[in-house]
């Protein structure tokens, strides 16, 4: 059984990267002078999460869709990398794969929202872009980000619940063995003493 910190590492990294990427998206809107910088940073973090060789922001969605369909057909297909890949390659518990796949589906929706935000800005609709990015109404970018984080939490919860259960069962098994172990130790000591008694008598 993997230690809890090892098994949860891709999930913890994915969450941290996700929040950083979401912040880059907001900065992209609010700091026109550095939009190119924040766009590059957002793409770099996206690649850390779900890596697609040679992808740009313009091609990322198609690459994600194509590689994900390939994975659904063959779980050994290696067309993408990143934290999602690490988690999907380390499925251990019942229900974990379905939950992990749900995180990719919600992530894909969030990525499509990002492209909509950039398209609105390019069309001169800055107010609409800001509203779509910052609002929490159903169907907006933040709402989809929340759904993505909830899906990620579900995977984490599955891992935590099973690991906690395994640790508890292990401790229970050890506790059950302790009385037997103590009894066997006392018996061994008694037998040893009995075996030495005749030899000690020789020196009297």
Model regions: which residues?
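N-terminal membrane-entry
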Residues: 169-187
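Membrane-proximal N-terminal soluble sensing/regulatory segments of transmembrane proteins
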Residues: 3-102, 128-129, 133
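Polar/charged, Q/E/K-enriched amphipathic alpha-helical segments with strong coiled-coil propensity
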Residues: 81-149, 167
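Juxtamembrane amphipathic/hinge helix adjacent to a transmembrane helix
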Residues: 146-170
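Soluble, cytosolic/nucleoplasmic coiled-coil alpha-helices used as oligomeric scaffolds and tethers
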Residues: 31, 120-123, 127, 158-161, ...
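Juxtamembrane interface at the cytosolic side of transmembrane helices
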Residues: 1, 182-204
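Sec/Tat-exported extracytoplasmic proteins
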Residues: 18, 22-25, 107, 111-114, ...
């Amino acid at each position: 059984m993997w230690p809890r910190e090892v098994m949860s590492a891709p999930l913890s990294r994915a969450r941290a990267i996700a929040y950083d990427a979401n912040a880059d998206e907001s900065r992209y809107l609010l700091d026109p002078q550095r939009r190119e910088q924040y766009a590059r940073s957002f793409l770099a973090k996206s690649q850390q999460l779900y890596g697609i060789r040679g992808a740009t922001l313009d091609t990322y969605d198609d690459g994600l869709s194509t590689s994900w369909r390939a994975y659904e057909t063959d779980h050994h297909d290696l067309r993408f990398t990143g934290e999602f890949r690490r988690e999907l390659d380390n499925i251990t518990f019942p229900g974990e794969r379905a939950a992990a796949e749900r995180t990719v589906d919600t992530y894909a929706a969030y990525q499509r929202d990002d492209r909509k935000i950039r398209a609105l800005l390019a069309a001169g609709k800055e107010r609409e872009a800001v509203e779509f990015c910052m609002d929490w109404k159903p169907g907006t970018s933040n709402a989809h980000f929340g759904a993505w984080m909830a899906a990620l939490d579900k995977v984490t919860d599955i891992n935590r619940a099973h690991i906690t259960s395994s640790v508890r069962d292990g401790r229970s098994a050890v506790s059950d063995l302790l009385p037997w172990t103590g009894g066997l130790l006392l018996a061994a000591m008694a037998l040893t003493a009995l075996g030495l008694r005749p030899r000690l008598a020789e020196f009297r």
